[in-house]
Design a protein with these regions (language model features):
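Generic secondary-structure microfeatures
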Residues: 37-39, 69, 191, 196
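Flexible, active-site-proximal loop/turn residues at the rims of small-molecule/cofactor binding pockets
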Residues: 39, 72, 259
Length: 289
């Protein structure tokens, strides 16, 4: 794993060194501290302010930090400890103008089991992450080739999680429709589709892209299930318009005050999302058999 943060500006390097100090001050059982996410990939956004749809918005990437411990803590205990580390880090800083720290934690045993079983979130951290602190007492596992039973179990686990998540969004969309909240309904329909497509991708590949674009996700899902493209054909102008509306809903339904979605739009979209649900269930369950 990489260890250098010299590509970052001095202030960022100082921040990360201080984060390490704050964690070690309150957590003697800490074995590793790993930077992951956009700062590890050097794709971070330091500060971006713009006017979108008449609303001033700003965005800053977080410091994503994985804290690895020698023992497995109860959730409320480790949350309390890392909350102390966070508070200590912000002392003397303007908390609302500083880069936010987001901690996750794993015991070394659980982390190594996840890497060994090729769980993509953790293998990505190992591949892209930067070791900020290492006690030297443990080593990270190597990912290995899974046997058929393990592949089947992991595919089924991913499918059950994402498919149920998609169903939750679809249920929320139905509540929104009944309440005549069509704009937020379109967002929940987008999220349902995103998770249905990811159900297919994960079931077939055990990997999920960091992606919200339905254009991209539908294309990837189609390589594993040609039938998935039947839910949103784009042969006519109206079919294209409905798909574009759903694609745009991820951002515009939340931030654009003037984004317009009608009852008729929702009534046309829901059967398409339900068809995608049924296709997803069929192709994924056949794959897992």
């Amino acid at each position: 794993m990489k260890t250098s943060i010299n590509y970052l500006p001095e202030q960022k390097r100082d921040d990360l060194r201080r984060i390490v100090e704050c964690v070690l001050e309150v957590l003697p059982d800490c074995e590793m501290i790993i930077l992951y996410g956009s700062y590890a990939r050097n794709t971070y956004v330091d500060y971006d302010q713009r006017i979108e749809y008449g609303i001033r918005t700003c965005f800053m990437s977080d410091y994503d930090i994985l804290v690895v411990t020698s023992t497995r803590f109860q959730r409320y205990i480790i949350n309390h400890i890392l909350s102390k580390a966070t508070d200590n880090y912000y002392k003397g800083k303007n908390r609302y103008a500083s880069t936010t720290v987001q901690f996750i934690d794993e015991s070394i045993d659980d982390l190594n089991k996840a890497i060994d079983k090729n769980r993509y979130f953790y293998t990505d951290i190992k591949r892209e992450g930067i070791m900020l602190y290492n006690s030297g007492r443990y080593k990270l596992a190597r990912r290995r080739k899974l046997n058929y039973r393990e592949i089947k179990e992991l595919a089924e686990e991913y499918y059950n999680d994402r498919f149920e998540r998609a169903n939750d969004f679809l249920r929320n969309a139905m509540y929104d429709k009944n309440d005549e909240r069509y704009k937020i309904c379109s967002f929940h329909l987008h999220q349902a589709c995103e998770n249905y497509y990811n159900s297919i991708i994960l079931t077939f590949t055990l990997y999920s892209p960091k992606e919200h674009s339905l254009i991209t996700l539908s294309g990837r899902a189609k390589t594993h299930s040609l039938e998935s493209s039947e839910a949103f054909p784009r042969d006519t102008e109206e079919e294209k318009r409905l798909f574009d509306l759903l694609q745009d809903a991820y951002v515009q339904a939340r931030y654009n005050l003037h984004f317009r979605v009608t009852k008729e739009d929702i009534e046309a979209l829901i059967p398409k999302v339900e068809l995608l649900r049924d296709i997803t269930r069929q192709c994924c369950e056949e794959r897992i058999k």
